[in-house]
Amino acid sequence: MSAEVSHATAYADVADALADYFDGLYFSDTARLRRIFHPQAIYACATEGKLLHLTMQEYFPIVDKRPSPASRAEPRADRIVSIEFAGPVTAFVRLHCAIGPKLFTDLLTLIHVEGRWQIISKVFHFDLKSS
């Protein structure tokens, strides 16, 4: 197998894995999110001027409690901007999505462990939609 074919396959595999991420957020479905997030992943943001740093054990209950964008019939704004590889088992993804009034830019680092791509870190910024 050539490196070009391998890279194309890895790109497609990461993009496919992100379907669980996008669907998990849109439907507030932590079962889907647990498939894409490594159990030891971190979640971080400083958009509001201070560090927000959560473990998955802290993050998933927040998702479970919030009304899903799907339940409010919000239009989906999921878009992969880029996927880059640092090596065969490490990928960096920049993507956009929206939940409620927030437009997110997510920077995800994924690792390929246990036979699948998993998010090991999510660092993000958000802007509020214009009224």
Residue spans of the language-model regions?
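Short linear sequence elements within intrinsically disordered, low-complexity coil regions
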Residues: 16, 26-27, 31-32, 42, ...
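Surface-exposed, charged secondary-structure patches
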Residues: 6, 13, 42-103
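Short, low-complexity N-terminal intrinsically disordered segments enriched in polar/charged residues
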Residues: 1-31, 35-39, 57-58
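Beta-strand-connecting loop/turn residues
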Residues: 39, 88-89, 115-116
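Compositionally biased, low-structure terminal segments
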Residues: 23, 60-61, 125-127
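Short beta-strand segments enriched in hydrophobic/aromatic residues
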Residues: 37, 97, 123-124
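Short beta-strand edge/turn micro-motifs at domain boundaries
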Residues: 92, 103-131
